[in-house]
Amino acid sequence: MDKALYEAGLEVRKATLGKEFVENAIASADDFNRPLQEFVTEYCWGACWTRPGLPRKTRSMLNLAMLTALNRPHELKMHLKGALTNGVTREEIREILLQTGVYCGVPAAVDAFRTAKEVFAELDKK
């Protein structure tokens, strides 16, 4: 493992998803899934998210579209929160999800809208 890349990824991951969430994910890792946590932190967050070509906001917007297309509601929920942290507005999220309906199918967009509404309601309670 590239320790510097891992640490850079850990910093971005915590800044986007929240320190508590990331620390819980790492702390709850066991011998089976710890390599995945390390891989995700080093490569997804370290090698990709730290690149200079796109700002975090744009990367978050891309992730919302891709996770909707892949029908991954658990990951979408997490990245919706991260997108808001990275400056994506609820209006921009709505537009992203509307566009996924055209290119990924209405059922994918319906599920993504449902997930977004759950996230917004959860955040509005705080």
What are these regions (language model features)?
Residues 40-44, 61-68, 96-101:
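Short alpha-helical scaffolding segments that buttress acidic/His motifs in well-ordered protein cores
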Residues 47, 51, 69-76, 104-107:
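Amphipathic alpha-helical interaction segments
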Residues 61-64, 68-94:
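Mid-chain, well-packed structural core segment of small domains
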Residues 81, 98-101, 117:
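Short amphipathic alpha-helical surface patches that mediate protein-protein
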Residues 1-57, 85, 110-126:
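Acidic, glycine/proline-rich low-complexity segments that act as flexible tails and inter-domain linkers
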Residues 91-95, 111-114:
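A glycine-rich phosphate/pyrophosphate-binding beta-strand-loop-alpha-helix module
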Residues 16-19, 73, 87, 103-106:
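Residues at alpha-helix boundaries and the short loops/turns that link adjacent helices
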Residues 99, 106-110:
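Substrate/cofactor-recognition hotspot
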